[in-house]
A protein has these predicted regions:
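Cofactor-pocket helix-loop regions in the catalytic cores of large enzyme subunits
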Residues: 1-40, 63, 120, 136-167
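Short amphipathic alpha-helical segments
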Residues: 10-13, 76-80, 101-103, 120-121
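Short glycine- and Lys/Arg-enriched binding-loop motifs that mark or flank ligand-binding interfaces
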Residues: 27-29, 40-46, 64, 101, ...
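Glycine-rich, N-terminal phosphate-binding loop of Rossmann-like dinucleotide-binding domains
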Residues: 1-2, 67-68, 111
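Active-site rim loops that border cofactor/substrate pockets in soluble metabolic enzymes
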Residues: 31-50, 57
Length: 167
């Protein structure tokens, strides 16, 4: 999620949709705070200043729901390599935001809070959930990435000396 989640007061419906569908969530720098950072489904910020887990999850995704994100150069790190196998659904209030740097397979124009609220209602009405076996395998992979490199990928030592990177 990007800055429009914050500006469009869409954190509530974004959180509700992600939790209903058990989806992993990443944020851009401008979108930080748009999803609870302590929630298990939050993978961290993506891009050059983001987490290893968030970047790998995005890269290996089959579908990306981009909510109010700009796809700037610090996030995509080269359009040709960005999420090569993903279908991208992009929600934004500004139609000029679509396909500037990353092609949107589906572009949804509208206020992000209204669009997400409607999506929540549709998911409730349909009553279907994602394939649980596929989703369990995906979360297992994400948890493996978290365990390997997480937010603290360095050796913390034996604890007798505090290393600068732990502060």
């Amino acid at each position: 999620s990007g800055g429009c989640v914050i500006m469009g007061t869409a954190a509530g419906p974004l959180t509700e949709l992600a939790q209903m569908l058990n989806l992993p969530v990443t944020n851009t720098l401008m979108g930080l705070g748009g999803y609870p950072g302590a929630d298990r489904q939050f993978l961290g910020m993506l891009g050059m200043h983001g987490s290893f887990t968030a970047n790998l999850a995005m890269h290996h995704s089959d579908v990306i729901l981009a909510v109010g994100a700009r796809f700037d150069d610090r996030v995509i790190n080269g359009a040709a390599k960005f999420c090569p196998n993903a279908k991208i659904i992009h929600i934004d209030i500004d139609p000029a935001s679509f396909s500037k740097t990353i092609k949107a397979d589906i572009a949804i124009v509208g206020p992000v809070d209204s669009v997400l609220t409607e999506m929540v209602a549709i998911v409730r009405e349909i009553g279907e959930t994602p394939n649980q076996d596929a989703q369990a395998a995906w979360w297992k992979q994400i948890d493996e990435w978290r365990g390997n490199r997480g937010l603290f990928p360095y050796d913390k030592g034996d604890g007798s000396i505090i290393k600068p990177q732990t502060v």
